[in-house]
Amino acid sequence: MNTVTELLRADSRVSGYKFNIHKKESFELFFVKGRLETVRSTDTCDREVTVYVDHDGFRGDAQFFIYPSTTAEQLRALIDEAVGKALLIDNQAYELPEKQTGSYTVESNFADYAPGELAGLIAEAVFSANDIPNASLNSVEIFLNRHTETVVNSRGLDKTQVRYDAMVEAIPTYNGEKQSVELYQQYNFSTMDPEAIRAEIADKLAAVKARYEAVTPEQPLDCPVVLNRQELAELFGSIAQDLNYASVYAHANLFRKGQPIQKAPTGDPIGITMTGQIPGSVRSARFDSDGLSLGSIRLVEDGQAVNYYGSNRYGQYLGETPTGSLPCLAADPGTAGTPQGTYLEVISMSGLQVDLYNDYIGGEIRLAYYHQGGQVLPVTGISISGCLSQVLNTIRLSSDTAVYRGYQGPAQAILSQMKIF
């Protein structure tokens, strides 16, 4: 990177620059019908350069990638092209972070294992979950990743972080008398916990059997709806995104600081904190792509918006202290225990739709469990919809918590006044 640094510093048109360097080392296992077919390791490095150009009271920027084979002559051409593109962008002026340096590691017990050993332990946990007759894991792929990320800019910032993650992709299959049913599963984690891995795969194997057995209800259902962690991550994530600096700057936010999100609450109060790190989350980071150190900030307290959050650029635009692009969301647990009585537990959706402006929440259900009188009936071919403001006012949140990607919070939520059709 020395040559490109020298060329950028020597170019009077360039007002600033930033390097984002991402080195990724992976170890991968590929299984077909329980048999290990392929073992692969990779080592890649992406080097992205951002060029900033101040012009006419504005700041423009443009990016390009460089490779080990990129020559000095090619670098000059890339810089010239980037300057030309940046001159076409009229962003409000802002400053880059400055004079922060350091090397960091995101906490993970992956560092305690050799890659091959860890991959083998994960595979053992995955296949030990297969204890349902006529069910199998048709295909399993395991990816272990070690990321080394560096941010350097023209104002003296120079930071490096190391973080780890793993992904298991599996095709659980159930072979019934009438047909064979397959589901797709992607499980991401950054802490080695064999029991958690086994439970995750076992739940999906149970789900594929249930999907085979699922029926479409003959009569409309009328009962509370229970959402699990994936849908709750989408619900709370929609609220958090509305309070992001970028949304506020664009006047695209519905909620305002100091105003209630739950206007007439009768359920559990909603609390949301945005943070840089959550134990076990694959999105945890010590700093963002601008190099800003990531802490935490309370967004929602007792159902009321109390802060905004966001990137260096948009924080400066709003006159707020930049928090950085915080990747993790922690939602407060509630007081609800295990749901009782008659209710519909959502297992899989085509995607939860949350429309803040149209006061809507709903979506198509691929698989759900209908609980009634101690019996559980797998159902499919139905949808749910409701008034978002009513749902937020009456929501009951579980005291048990779960982690899903960048989310940590209630494992379940009970929604009333939902239409099932």
Each model region followed by its residue ranges:
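Dual-mode signal for accessory low-complexity, basic/Gly-rich regions
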Residues: 260-421
